Amino acid sequence: MKNTIEYVTVDNNHYLFHSDISFSMFIHPELAKVCGRQSGVDPYYVRKYAYLKDKGFFGEVLPVEFATTLEKSVIENNIAQVPQVSFETTDHCNLNCRYCSLGDLYTFSKKERKNIDPQKALRLLRFLFDVKLEGSEFAIVFFGGEPLVNGRFVEMIVEEAKRLNEKKKLKLEFTITTNATLIDRYLDLLVDNQFKMLISLDGDEKGQGYRTFMKDGTNSFWQAIRNIDRLQCEYPDFFEERVDFNAVLHDRNSVQEIYEFIYNRYHKIPSIAQMNKDHVNKEKKELMEQMFVDRRVSESDFQKTNSDLLPVVHDELIQFKELNDFFANNSVNFYMTNLLDLLYDHVSLIPTKTCSPFQRKMFFNTNSQI
């Protein structure tokens, strides 16, 4: 199998892609003719082809060598430098979202709901503060369930982290993902500690229709909106700087409706996720097919409109992001953000193609597992 392929865009622009080094570059049509073994080609591009071949293009794909072991010292170093710890604060939620990953739509749903063990979580937090370097960055994340159902735990961890940080002087940040229906009870906690908030909101009242209250099945839209509006009104600077939104795409909303509602009301561009189609309960497949909407299709419909928001959200659309990522990471203009990227032919890969454990974050769940 060759390591270099030539491809042509719809506008008849020619590119080469070198798979061994994940490198893409724009080429002249004459060079494309040489690649296609056509005759009557400008001799300059014949020489250019020979030069590229001498530098490793148009050869056989190199075999991939995987690292088989991770040294203990690597893991210990990762833990000492871990930039984030995420606490699964609780399995409980005050909402009963139809598409929730903890619900019966999926086979990996949790049958037993419980809160995190606070003493074990505190022990982990103190250990991490003990091993981290003074002045380093450290984010503490709370998720669930709805983490504010177990708000006392959040308060406890914040208090302890601040106490520990009096000595350690870390660049400390708190983050929470919430459905916003309980934030009115914890505004002082969230604002005083400059939480980074990610609010889950699926758009307008119809779009929010799958996010119903556990106790009576009513739509959570107005409770969430009242709380979000209050947060924006009473703490406008905090809201502007520390609050973001995410939404789930389904058959009761659309990419256009989500963007237009959240941007027009809060001047925020939300992230949008389509429903996960893996591990679906066999008995719920029909429901999944009813609810599922392909984001690409919904984005395509949005792009066919004359919405004033199209230029505003352009950079968030899948097509732009994929193209941007491809050229950012696979072109002659690739900006190296990691020195290891320069050593692609010397660094062994992990078979799962992931980062090594705790290199980026650490999770602690309600079963006291890391």
Over which residues does each language-model region extend?
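N-terminal [4Fe-4S]-dependent radical SAM core
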Residues: 2-17, 21-26, 45-86, 104, ...
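Short amphipathic alpha-helical recognition elements used for nucleic-acid or partner binding
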Residues: 26-39
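A broadly conserved sequence feature marking short terminus-proximal activation segments
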Residues: 46-68, 323-325, 353-354, 358-370
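Conserved alpha-helical substructure of the radical SAM core
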Residues: 71-185
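Hydrophobic faces of well-ordered beta-strands that scaffold small-molecule active sites
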Residues: 85, 138-140, 174-176, 197-199, ...
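Conserved radical SAM core fold
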Residues: 106-107, 147-149, 180-184, 196-218, ...
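Short amphipathic alpha-helices and their capping/turn segments at secondary-structure boundaries
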Residues: 125-129, 182-196, 259-265
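Radical SAM enzyme [4Fe-4S]-AdoMet core and its adjacent flexible, acidic
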Residues: 211-225, 229, 233-357, 363-367
